[in-house]
Amino acid sequence: MLDIRVIRENPEEVKARLKPRSGDAWKLVDDVLACDEARRNAETEKQALQSERNATSKQIGMLKKKGEDTSSIEARVREIGDRIRELDRVAEENAAQLTSLLMNIPNLPHLECPVGADETANPEIKLWGEKPAIENPKDHVELAANLGMISFEDGARITGSGFVVYRGAGARLERALINFLLNTQTVENGYQEVGVPFVVKRECMEGTGQLPKFEEDMYGTEDQQMFLIPTAEVPVTNLYRDTILQESDLPIKMAAYTPCFRREAGSAGRINRGMIRVHQFDKVELVQILKPEDSFRELEVLRSHAESILQKLGLHYRVIELCTGDLGFSSAKTYDIEVWAPGQGQYLEVSSCSCFTDYQARRMRLRYKDADGKNQFCHTLNGSGTALPRLYVALLETYQQPDGSIRIPEALVPYFGADCIRPEQA
């Protein structure tokens, strides 16, 4: 969440930076200021009354020693006590309302973030490789069906639409990709692998910013206190909630494989056909916790770690920077990496790399002790390193052969155990 002091001291600047975002969150700034002022006024009056009560109580003791009547003064003490209790209620109510408002205000976009209303204003900043020349490319649905690799029908029968069953070489390829992703990010790029639960508490979802805004998109228990994770970002970052780290502990770099669960699955049609948008998918997530002065520089490094996966697999991709209107709720700056899928004839997002500044850390109370011994909020980064099954889709469609087989990229062969998937092998 945003620092209340920043809002208090620079309300018009905060509004100006929030206005280019989608939605009307900037309108909440005045409500925040009103709640903050009411809470602070209640606390100020309470402190004054407590001082008066202390002084009056001493006066009562002195008067009683002299045998003088103290009934009127004692009445005032009772009156003060009643007022203090009322002020406690007012302060508590306004503090709760203030927290609720702050939880619904997104992060401030980085000052150099491109300004735009939606994804059509996202600039392309990098292009790697070339689109493969494939005559009449088949899409992954047809390719995988012919090879018996995946079944949407089985997924629908077991669970419902938007779920996939992998079989034979299809399941083997998914496992190979996961191991390839993890090994690349841990062995080569220096992340510590962590294994985390796939179910988290509500407070963890609030900590990384998925709640309260995106609650309808999440799978939760009936009382909405426990949730299936939409991304490993949630449990991994929350490993350090309510923690004060030492400066020497930073940076912390973690990578985790998890399945991810999301209710939203998009509309029907070719753009969402097959595995493009599903309710459950696998992903390797990268998370960094670091000092504020390092965060935007390291975002570029993290992005290169995600890009390295596509380069090793020889997949054509582009990088776009999200404009203010397309920026994620908790993010100050985001790059999307989109891989080319020949059978779809479009780019598919496989990684989103973001810097959250101290936004998540404030929600999680994640701090570190600096060289002067003062507690400072950490900055957090995360990015997909990368997501499946869109990577799976691009791989099938890019390496399809005229005979219907799928060539396995050289970097993946040691993990898959073969250099090709043929109908008789699937």
From Swiss-Prot:
Record: residues binding ATP: 262-264, 278, 349-352
Entry-linked InterPro entries: aa-tRNA-synt_IIb, aa-tRNA-synth_II, aa-tRNA-synth_II/BPL/LPL, Ser-tRNA-ligase_type_1, Ser-tRNA-synth_1_N, SerRS_1_N_sf, SerRS_core, tRNA-bd_arm
Keyword Nucleotide-binding: yes
Localization in the cell: Cytoplasm
Any Pfam family: tRNA-synt_2b
Name of protein: Serine--tRNA ligase
Record field: compositional bias (Polar residues): 47-59
Location (main, coarse): cytoplasm
Alphabetical list of CDD domains matching this protein: SerRS_core
Assembly and binders: Homodimer. The tRNA molecule binds across the dimer.
Protein role: Catalyzes the attachment of serine to tRNA(Ser). Is also able to aminoacylate tRNA(Sec) with serine, to form the misacylated tRNA L-seryl-tRNA(Sec), which will be further converted into selenocysteinyl-tRNA(Sec).
Alphabetical list of NCBIfam families matching this protein: serS (TIGR00414)
GO BP terms, alphabetized: selenocysteine biosynthetic process; seryl-tRNA aminoacylation
Gene: serS
Region (Disordered): 44-67
Stated family: Belongs to the class-II aminoacyl-tRNA synthetase family. Type-1 seryl-tRNA synthetase subfamily.
Residues given in the record as L-serine binding sites: 231-233, 285, 384
Keyword ATP-binding: yes
Reactions this protein catalyses: tRNA(Ser) + L-serine + ATP = L-seryl-tRNA(Ser) + AMP + diphosphate + H(+); tRNA(Sec) + L-serine + ATP = L-seryl-tRNA(Sec) + AMP + diphosphate + H(+)
Native source organism of the sequence: Akkermansia muciniphila (strain ATCC BAA-835 / DSM 22959 / JCM 33894 / BCRC 81048 / CCUG 64013 / CIP 107961 / Muc)
Protein EC: 6.1.1.11
Keyword tags: Aminoacyl-tRNA synthetase, ATP-binding, Cytoplasm, Ligase, Nucleotide-binding, Protein biosynthesis
GO cellular component: cytoplasm
